[in-house]
Each structure stands twice: as structure tokens, then as C-alpha cells.
Amino acid sequence: MNIIPCSIKTLKGLYDISGVEVGQHFYWQIGGFQIHAQVLITSWVVITILLGSVVIAVRNPQTIPTDGQNFFEYVLEFIRDLSKTQIGEEYGPWVPFIGTMFLFIFVSNWSGALLPWKIIELPHGELAAPTNDINTTVALALLTSAAYFYAGLSKKGLSYFEKYIKPTPILLPINILEDFTKPLSLSFRLFGNILADELVVVVLVSLVPLVIPIPVMFLGLFTSGIQALIFATLAAAYIGESMEGHH
């Protein structure tokens, strides 16, 4: 029986897992500020992929759409329907915002699984998907908060703040707390799911052959897309709620 070799192999796998940790960050010093370079680099890559894909697909629009043009028209129609469902008839001005959120998060999430970030060596730390960093998800959530405050104020003016005392002033603390929990839930849900997916893959690769974690990686691609959809749907719902009233 090969009990001892198997035990040694298992212990080695557990030792490898013990070495999985959150690495150091790579910073740029600009003036008196420390800039988180890892997030900026990967975010620029994602933005370049998005802009490049759009330019290539629709640089020469045709009356009879090509495959690339068809795909982006379908994506636009999907985002438009999502915005209309959640926001209502005044959805038009918010389609670019919701679309930007959805596409950036979707491509960022998928880049973590499909792009070989880790082969690029940095002086400190390593590259990963932008949404694998809490700074990115918090920034996206704060942008969403600013958007629904702007939507409510532009529609109702200062009377927007009446929602905090409806249906009764007793609920004022809870209604105020709700505006703090929205960005928290958005940011930590997205960050936690993407980070957990990458950690699960790292642990499985350390324990078993590479072929076995592949189904988990495909599941990660699916959940990454779902997370982008959830974020965009909630962002649109919050904007619609701020324009319509307290629910």
C-alpha cells in the first residue's frame, strides 16, 4: 500500500495552501500620494478591451449588421430593457451609466479567469482582476450612490429628502442607515464573490491535478456574469426608486 507517499503528497498540498495569502500591493508614488498601481493597470487593460472591441465591431456600420455589430446591438438592447424595467419610462439618460457598470464589471470578472495576469511579474504583489480589489468595488458602489442621489434630487429637488420621514418620522434613523448599507452591500457582495472564486481555484489547484478544478473555473465564469448582472440591476433599481419615491 502507498499510504506514506499519499500522506506526504497530501501534506505537501496542505503546506502549499498555507502559503496562499494576500500579497503585497504595488504602488506608484505620484507627488505625495500612493497610487494603487495594480488596480489601475488591470482597469486600463479592461477599458482597452472594451473600447477596442467596440471600435472593431462597429467602425463601419452596415445596413445588414455583421456578427460583431449584431452582438453589440444585442448587448445594447439587453441593457436598455434592463434599465427600462428597473427605472421606468425615464430610463433613457441612464442607459450609458448602467451599461458602463455592467460591461466593466462583466469584463473585469471574466478577465480574472481568462487572462494570465500572474505571469506578469511586478516588484511587489501580482496582477488580478480589478473587481478582486475592494477599492474598485467600493468606488463602483459609491458611484452608484452618487447616481441615485443625483437622480432623486434632479427629479424632486430638496423634497427628495422627505423620503427619510416617510411613512413616519420614527423611521428616520433606519431610512438614513439604508443609504449607507446600499453601497456596502453592493461593494462587499461583488468583492467577496470574485475573491472567493479565485481562492477556491487556487486551493483546488494546490491539492489536485489541474484538470479537476476546470469545472469550478467554468462555474466561476457563470457566477462572474451573474454578479455583473446583479450589480447593474440593483444600481438601476436604486435609481428608479429614488426617482419614484420610497418603497
From Swiss-Prot:
This is ATP synthase subunit a, chloroplastic. InterPro entries: ATP_syn_F0_a_bact/chloroplast (IPR045082), ATP_synth_F0_asu (IPR000568), ATP_synth_F0_asu_AS (IPR023011), F0_ATP_A_sf (IPR035908). The keyword Transmembrane helix applies. It is a multi-pass membrane protein. PROSITE patterns: ATPASE_A. Belongs to the ATPase A chain family. F-type ATPases have 2 components, CF(1) - the catalytic core - and CF(0) - the membrane proton channel. CF(1) has five subunits: alpha(3), beta(3), gamma(1), delta(1), epsilon(1). CF(0) has four main subunits: a, b, b' and c. Gene3D superfamilies: ATP synthase, F0 complex, subunit A. GO terms for molecular function: proton-transporting ATP synthase activity, rotational mechanism. Keywords: ATP synthesis, CF(0), Chloroplast, Hydrogen ion transport, Ion transport, Membrane, Plastid, Thylakoid, Transmembrane, Transmembrane helix, Transport. It is found in: Plastid, Chloroplast thylakoid membrane. The keyword Transmembrane helix applies. The chain crosses the membrane at residues 38-58, 95-115, 134-154, 199-219, 220-240. It comes from the Eukaryota.
